[in-house]
Amino acid sequence: MAETTRLLVDADACPVKDEIYRVGARYGLKTVIVANSWMNIPQSPLIERVVVPEGPDVADDWIAEQATPADIVITNDVPLAVRCLAKQTSVLRPNGEEIDERSVGMVSAMRDLMQGLRETGAVTTYNPSFGKADRSRFLSALDTLIVRLRRKAALARTVPSSSQTIHRPVPGDVP
């Protein structure tokens, strides 16, 4: 049986939660909000709140353990993205950038570079401001990713597995 796509949200600092709720409802997707503190979420059978204990990477650990190849993880956390990609889970940043096998190396290198620059005091800001263009880019990327995963799941349902392959004898075949 094919797994159903869920939206797993690293929610503590996620600026696009409202957008995620709307897109999840439009597609009928289960949305799991994971945080280390209680958050107000819309009342919906499709939205689940998971409050994990406080501590470094506890929410990340929960998401990484629960993620499947059918899911979409929404996070800005690069180490979490790397862990999810290892499980073939799709990863989307709140700015609409998809992190995949092709981009993860550059994203990781940029994270390490910026962290080093912050530690030396060469850079003092963490993130640029988040605006309408970022929200729009995120919505477009999330729609595209959901459609791609649905097509992939539909294709997987129509392609017979090797156990379903029918062998028709050809004249001259030896049983």
Swiss-Prot record:
InterPro entries: UPF0178. CDD domains: PIN_YqxD-like. It comes from the Bacteria. It holds the Pfam family DUF188. Belongs to the UPF0178 family. This is UPF0178 protein GOX1710.
